[in-house]
Amino acid sequence: IQETLSSFLPVLIFIQERYQTIKEIIAQEEDKDENKLLEIFSDFAFENDEIIEINSDNNAEPVEVDVTAIEKEIKKLSRQTNRLIKLLEEKNPDKAEKQKVLIKETLMGVIISPKLFDLLQQIIITYMNEVKRYEKEIRELVVNKAGLPMDEFRKTFIGNETKLTWIDKYIRAKRKYSSILNKNKAKIVANQKRLAKLEDASFLTIQGIKEVNRELNMGRIRADRAKKEMVEANLRLVISIAKKY
């Protein structure tokens, strides 16, 4: 899942902004106590799948977390993200792909708290929900209201989601659906422009956003399956030990 997150620019930008907020909080802190720093960095430091809670158990052995190392990696990730944005804006796909590999390697080495991890996944889900919403509105206007056959819609709309002239050939076709499409052209194009904004924000095509979402779903399924298998294995071990006694 973390590998999928590293391929979605809005996630990387969110981490940048989160880190910037952390830096601002630290700058305002008069007392640079190590415990307080750990609390602030809890987004990026956890032990045994639990966010570190400072002084939550006075009898527990203190967990050593290298705040400097965490900050170093996040700074590195931020620089790499800025570099990626620049390459994407310059439309340099080859160098951008190489930069994505570096980002993936860095992010895979950053330990993220479960709470932040869920939040990062939600960013991808939110983008996908927006894609579904605008595509549904376009489909409602084109297929349900105008009567363009669903097969034809799917065949030509996929890959042309943000091509604003896509609907024109069906308006010019002088079919039963043409006049209704012409009446609703402004609404159709408006939704296509909303889809285009999602592409601009993510530096991905609509199909690219869908692919990231598919990868995320597959990753979550694999993670859930692995957890289930671990629980079942532990249960079998407990039963095996119990039988001996």
Q: What feature does the model see in each segment?
A:
Residues 1-245:
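Transcription initiation cofactors for RNA polymerase, centered on bacterial
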